[in-house]
Every structure is written in structure tokens, then in C-alpha cells.
Amino acid sequence: MAKVSSVQKNLKRSKLFNKLKLKRQALKSKIYDKNLSLEERFNLVLKLSKLPRNSSSTRIRNRCAETGRPRGYYRKFKLCRNIIRELAGSGIIPGLRKSSW
């Protein structure tokens, strides 16, 4: 099990990201707009840098929904490899079974 504080910190980051997602996208699209003057674009970069760091998507860590484990994460199931192995072995995940050849 991951530390509860790590999981909560990650949840807080993801909520902040979702809250400021549109604002961040709008600023980035204006920054890359070549029709604006260099000075205007520079001011937009300053506005973007004033947004909280945790509102960036790169600060969010994918974690297992069951255990909170950050490594060995499978996006399709939103679980770590250990839990997938347990659930697949007991037949809880439909359509997933251990391969054999």
C-alpha cells in the first residue's frame, strides 16, 4: 500500500489540473499564435508561469485504484500489475486470462 498522503496529494493535483485545464490550454494556444506580437506572447508566458505548478498534467502520477501503487500501472485497467494478476487469476476481470502456449 502506498502512503495515504501520497495518494491524497496526487488527487489534489488532479483536481487542480481539471479546474485550470481550459485556462492553461487557452494560454498555450495564444502563446504559439504567430499573429500576436512578441511582447504580447511574452506577457502570456508570464501569465502561464503564474499558474500553480500542480495544475500541470506532468505533475500527476498514475496510481493503482486499489492500492495506490505508482509503478507497474496499466492504464487500461487503472490497476497495478500485482492486483491485475490477483484479479485475473480469480477470474474477476472479464475476458482476461493467463496465457499458455
From Swiss-Prot:
Looking up SUPFAM superfamilies in the UniProt record yields: Glucocorticoid receptor-like (DNA-binding domain)
Keyword Ribonucleoprotein part of the UniProt annotation: yes
Pfam families found in the cross-reference section: Ribosomal_S14 (PF00253)
Please name the Gene3D superfamilies in this protein's record: 1.10.287.1480
Question: Which keywords annotate this record?
Answer: Ribonucleoprotein, Ribosomal protein, RNA-binding, rRNA-binding
Choose any GO biological process term that the UniProt entry carries and state it. translation
So which domain of life are we looking at? Bacteria
**GO MF annotations in UniProt:** rRNA binding; structural constituent of ribosome
UniProt keyword Cell inner membrane present: no
Family under the similarity heading: Belongs to the universal ribosomal protein uS14 family.
Q: Which proteins does it associate with, and in what oligomeric form?
A: Part of the 30S ribosomal subunit. Contacts proteins S3 and S10.
Instruction: Relate the protein's function as given in its record.
Output: Binds 16S rRNA, required for the assembly of 30S particles and may also be responsible for determining the conformation of the 16S rRNA at the A site.
Please name the HAMAP family in this protein's record.
Ribosomal_uS14_1
Name-wise, this protein is Small ribosomal subunit protein uS14
